């Protein structure tokens, strides 16, 4: 069974590309465009990780990261501006560093989380 990744983004161009990269890397992608939809998925389904685009406003990002933290689901924020603002995410990755850096960071985060479970 492929690990499921919740991908949250309101971006119309970048989100499908990012989701295709995740799927090509072997992840089952659950794409959503709103925080409310993301929170609903987190309450109803098993998710291995959360990927949050920079397009999600910081207060909304904080809500999702907090819910993920409570459920012990690691989260990665794709953030070229490094706006951490105490959002409880596990990791911030600059998407301009390329898909390999993003995928490596996600894989190492999920492996670390799996070892601590």
Please state what every model-predicted region is.
Residues 46, 69-78:
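His-Asp phosphorelay/catalytic-motif detector in bacterial-type signaling
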Residues 74-117:
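Output/docking surface of receiver
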Residues 26-33:
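Short hydrophobic/Thr-rich beta-strand motif most characteristic of the beta2 strand and flanking loop
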Residues 8-12, 52-56, 79-81, 95-96:
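Structural motif
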Residues 2-12, 18-22, 50:
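Conserved acidic segment of CheY-like receiver
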Residues 33-49:
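Acidic, metal-coordinating helix/loop segments flanking the phosphotransfer/catalytic sites
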Residues 52-70:
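Conserved phosphotransfer microenvironments
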Residues 24-25, 71:
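Conserved dinucleotide-binding and phosphotransfer motif residues
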